[in-house]
């Protein structure tokens, strides 16, 4: 089970976008995340008339490394760490380390 999953709200804790919040759009295999509205880059694309694509400057999100983001705790309003807890029925759930509350409630 991953500590940070798709659609989790995260906050950037290091880098040029430090302090920005967004949701996870994609989880990549190399330990990176694509976060909405964070780490924006400008991509210069050529027009492709065969596919009907127009050229120009396209702004999109670039991947950000997992060590530069942390899950955002709504209750405390700060970045938090993720822990795991095994419940009585044997299921494994994610919890916030600071408040011991369940993330996937």
From Swiss-Prot:
Q: Which GO terms describe its biological process?
A: translation
Q: Name one Pfam family in it.
A: KOW
Q: Which GO terms describe its molecular function?
A: rRNA binding; structural constituent of ribosome
Highest taxon of the source?
Bacteria
Which intervals of the chain form a coiled coil?
none
InterPro entries according to UniProt = KOW, Rib_uL2_dom2, Ribosomal_uL24, Ribosomal_uL24_CS, Ribosomal_uL24_KOW, Translation_prot_SH3-like_sf
Query: May I have one GO cellular component term?
Result: ribonucleoprotein complex
Q: Does the keyword Ribonucleoprotein apply?
A: yes
Q: Which UniProt keywords apply?
A: Ribonucleoprotein, Ribosomal protein, RNA-binding, rRNA-binding
Job of this protein: One of two assembly initiator proteins, it binds directly to the 5'-end of the 23S rRNA, where it nucleates assembly of the 50S subunit.
Self-association or partners: how does it assemble?
Answer: Part of the 50S ribosomal subunit.
* HAMAP family hit by this protein: Ribosomal_uL24_B
Q: What family does this belong to?
A: Belongs to the universal ribosomal protein uL24 family.
Task: Name it.
Answer: Large ribosomal subunit protein uL24
Q: Organism, per UniProt?
A: Chromohalobacter salexigens (strain ATCC BAA-138 / DSM 3043 / CIP 106854 / NCIMB 13768 / 1H11)
